[in-house]
Design a protein with these regions (language model features):
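Membrane-helix interface/capping residues of multi-pass secondary transporters
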Residues: 2-4, 78, 152, 241
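Secretory targeting signals
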Residues: 3-56, 82-150, 170, 174-177, ...
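Residue-level recognition of pore/gate-forming positions within transmembrane alpha-helices
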Residues: 11-15, 89, 160-164, 225-226
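Transmembrane helix segments
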Residues: 20, 152-189
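Transmembrane helix boundary and interhelical loop/hinge segments in multi-pass membrane proteins
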Residues: 52-74, 78-79, 86
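Long, glycine/tryptophan/cysteine-rich extracytoplasmic
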Residues: 184-201
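Junction motif at the cytosolic side of a transmembrane helix
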Residues: 219-241
Length: 241
């Protein structure tokens, strides 16, 4: 319970706090090419770590304390218990992220709604909602990794590597001509880039190659998360606690 409050509180504080600060520091003309929800992205890039940590702790903390035995004794259907955890976590994470991003977006729209900001439509709000769902998927992936690893620190380390290492690894691979193709692929398909694209902050591409579509970024994470969740069901059903 305490970890839930701290992680969700950190998420809200980062997204809303950093976002409102960014809104104040921008001018109306800055939003001619940016969506009103763009300032929320600055805090969300760090706040997504709070979602990842909460996803891991939702399942791994019970393994660490031994409470998972009590849980499975009270509710012998392990798959139903795991499903309930996924649903509750996913709902809470999505609502918290969406409300935080929406608050910052509305704040920006109120302060910078003049003609200098240019036209804005529902598409940018839909993109922000997709970005919030993207972060929620990262949390669900973290929860699946926590169920597989059963160790909080190890699962968090794995997820931090998944989120932060691809841009670094891709840049290193781009140095050598032999691996530049792989490096460009890694730089185009990773969590930070996907989040930026969904929020409508476009990139110019890597090495002359066009960036993948928003749907491609979302589909990749959906497939990876689905595979990890499926593996977690198989492992939790067969493995002793």
């Amino acid at each position: 319970m305490r970890s839930t409050l701290w992680t969700l509180g950190s998420l809200v504080a980062l997204v809303v706090g950093v976002g409102m600060l960014a809104v104040v520091q921008t001018a109306s003309q800055d939003y001619e090419k940016l969506p009103y929800t763009a300032p929320a992205l600055f805090g969300l890039m760090v706040g997504q770590i709070a979602v990842i940590v909460l996803g891991v702790l939702t399942i791994s903390s019970e393994y660490g304390t031994g409470l998972i035995r009590t849980t499975f004794t009270a509710a012998p259907d392990r798959l139903r218990v795991l499903t309930a955890k996924y649903l509750v976590f996913g709902t809470v994470a999505l609502l918290t992220t969406t409300l935080s991003v929406g608050f910052v977006g509305l704040w920006a729209a109120i302060l910078h709604s003049g003609p200098a900001a240019g036209p804005h439509g529902l598409a940018e709000w839909a993109g922000a909602l997709a970005g919030c769902f993207y972060v929620t998927l990262l949390g669900l992936l973290a929860m699946a990794v926590g169920a597989l690893v059963r160790h909080s620190a190890g699962a968090i380390a794995v997820m931090l590597g998944v989120v932060t290492m691809p841009p670094v690894l891709g840049s290193i691979l781009m140095v050598w001509p032999v691996t530049s193709g792989v490096g460009g692929l890694v730089l185009r398909y990773n969590a930070p880039v996907g989040l930026f694209q969904l929020f409508g902050v476009q990139d110019n591409g890597v090495g002359g190659a066009a960036m993948p579509s928003d749907l491609a970024q979302m589909t990749l994470l959906v497939l990876v998360t689905a595979a990890a969740v499926t593996a977690s069901y198989a492992v939790v059903r067969r493995r002793d606690v």
